[in-house]
Amino acid sequence: MAVNQEKEKAIELAMSAVERQFGKGSIMRLGNDEPMMRDVQAIPTGSISLDIALGVGGVPKGRIIEIFGPESSGKTTLCLHIVAEAQKRGGICGYVDAEHALDVGYARKLGVRTDDLLLSQPDTGEQALEIAEMLVRSGAIDVLVVDSVAALVPKAELEGEMGDAHMGVQARLMSQALRKLTGTIAKSQTCVIFINQIRMKIGVMFGNPETTTGGNALKFYASQRLDIRRIGAIKNGDNVVGSRTRVKVVKNKVAPPFKEVEFDIMYGTGISREGDLIDLASNENIVEKSGSWFSFNGERIGQGRENVKEYLREHPEIAKDIEGRVLEKYGIGKSGAPSPRRRTSPRRPKVAARSAAV
């Protein structure tokens, strides 16, 4: 007992010395640290099934997220939906457009308040990451999107000649930036999303030849990594009106990883929330499906998936009721944190079922 008291006294003296030298809050007991003990706060993604798969109701605040995939797979669309959801909740968002390709009209259609969005189109990778750091350090930004890592061109490469080899310059740039950013991001509770592109590794005989740009640092620092792919076309007659999209959570530090979900991205309007809702609700028998007819609370609400989507758009109160029941079923509460006793992996809706319903 005396030994324990001596140890306790020694620890208190050491903690006092640390606080004197480095300031109050530089060391503390974990149980007394309220910010560390609270539930993970999250921002919805615009897709209910993806919110459930991520385990906390969306992308977590104070963390780094990587969204990667092939061209035209929906990476920017997903990020703009996250920005729109953050703005709906009164958040301030920033967009570092290194690709110089942001479509403002499309962003508005997805619900982004472009008048309130902070936009930067930097010339170099160093400038882009410096701007990102300054915005995060302000402590006022809720979501910051960097689009994309592949477009962060180092200054040395810009000033050099075409054909010059610059081995590992971009990887070193990303590694240094993430070392500087990671602590500030956690303190400011900013969700920083990096969009990334896919490249092919040369000479890979076995395994996956795909890799992401910018080295390995982002893979380590990211709390969540989302692999987004276009897996099919949604047609209205002969016209392609959207894409069936699959997202796999390949890394997740705040919930179990490797969940997969599918949803519709409609051209011009983004993620189909109603379609996502129908798939989840019918899987859990909240909405009953008999042949091509869908029923809710014993009443038929439409024949065919597209007609039901239109019905839910016209009757938002019914859509809200169904959404509430779905979220309750999967254990996502008002705080966004899932109940540990409930299953959080959504069943994956099948593409064939969708096309048959249409």
Curated annotation (Swiss-Prot):
SMART domains: AAA. The keyword Hydrolase does not apply. InterPro entries: AAA+_ATPase, DNA_recomb/repair_RecA, DNA_recomb/repair_RecA_CS, P-loop_NTPase, RecA-like_C, RecA-like_N, RecA_ATP-bd, RecA_C_sf. It comes from the Bacteria. ATP binds at residues 69-76. Keywords: ATP-binding, Cytoplasm, DNA damage, DNA recombination, DNA repair, DNA-binding, Nucleotide-binding, SOS response. Residues 340-351 have a biased composition (Basic residues). GO terms for biological process: DNA recombination; DNA repair; SOS response. Residues 331-358 are annotated as: Disordered. GO terms for molecular function: ATP binding; ATP hydrolysis activity; ATP-dependent DNA damage sensor activity; damaged DNA binding; single-stranded DNA binding. Pfam families: RecA, RecA_C. GO terms for cellular component: cytosol. CDD domains: RecA (cd00983). It is found in: Cytoplasm. Can catalyze the hydrolysis of ATP in the presence of single-stranded DNA, the ATP-dependent uptake of single-stranded DNA by duplex DNA, and the ATP-dependent hybridization of homologous single-stranded DNAs. It interacts with LexA causing its activation and leading to its autocatalytic cleavage. NCBIfam families: tigrfam_recA (TIGR02012). Belongs to the RecA family. PANTHER family: MITOCHONDRIAL DNA REPAIR PROTEIN RECA HOMOLOG-RELATED, RECA. There are two genes for RecA in M.xanthus; recA1 seems less functional than recA2. This is Protein RecA 2. The lineage of its organism: Bacteria, Pseudomonadati, Myxococcota, Myxococcia, Myxococcales. The gene is recA2.
